[in-house]
Structures are given as structure tokens and as C-alpha cells.
Amino acid sequence: LNKQGKLGALFIDYLNLINIVVSKNQLQETTDLALGSIARKTKLMAEEMEIPVILLAQLNREVDRRQGLHFPVLSDLRNSGAIEQVADVVIFVYRAEKYNIFYDPKTKEDLRGVGLLLLAKNRNGATGIAKFRYNPAMTCLTDYDPRVI
């Protein structure tokens, strides 16, 4: 990977698309173990190459069944608790509009075009939330400014 020079970062879109060959009767357990192994190997590769590896992964459907604002949590990572254990940082991208929620029930803030980056895990620092603006017509994220609607 470094033949043309040092990589700045590696993006994998996404973990659950990596083909895993297993028998039908061992599918769930083997898939979980295989995805966990891939997550661990990805982390080792990041350390060896001294680059950040951004590994995208799907969430399970529990987040859709949750009441309220449907905020994802670490246990929502699909098919692999190992992702949660291995990752240095886990960030969820969240938009209330996806769940047909257009106003914050507590603050009454207009959530149309607003998204959140939920820093759910940060091995070397604090966790928290950062807001952003989302323009679906341009598939564009920008800094959040409360004066812009």
C-alpha cells in the first residue's frame, strides 16, 4: 500500500461488506468472530503503517426500534462486539430527520438539516456531541451555525 509513498489514511467502506465464507449452521457465530478478527487485524495494520484507519460499519436494527430520538449506542454496532472493544474511537453520524423527527422534544429546536456526530468512544479523551448542518440537495456537511436554518 505504501509503494507510491506513505498513505495519509485508509478508509474501509464498510466492514459488513467483506465476504466471509461459512456454513449455514455456523453463520452467526462465525460471522461475529470473523468480523471481530477483521477489526483486530485492521487495528494492527493501522499501528504498523502508522496511519488512521477509518472503518465504517452498519448498525443493527435495535436503534430503529428504540423510542424517542433513536440515538445509537455502542451495542448497536452490527455483528461484532469486537468493534467496540478494538476501536480507539467510535463516532456515530445521526440525523433525527431519518426518523421523521423534525423538532427536539425538549428544546423545540428545529432539527431539519441538522445532524450530530456522537463521539461514543474515545480511548484517549472525552466523549461528546458535535452538531453539523446537512444539505441533502448537495450531500454536503458544513459547520453548525444556529443562525442558519
Predicted feature locations:
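Structural recognition of the conserved hydrophobic beta-strand(s) that form the central parallel beta-sheet
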Residues: 11-12, 51-58
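…and closely analogous acidic/polar surface helices at protein-protein or active-site interfaces
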Residues: 34-39
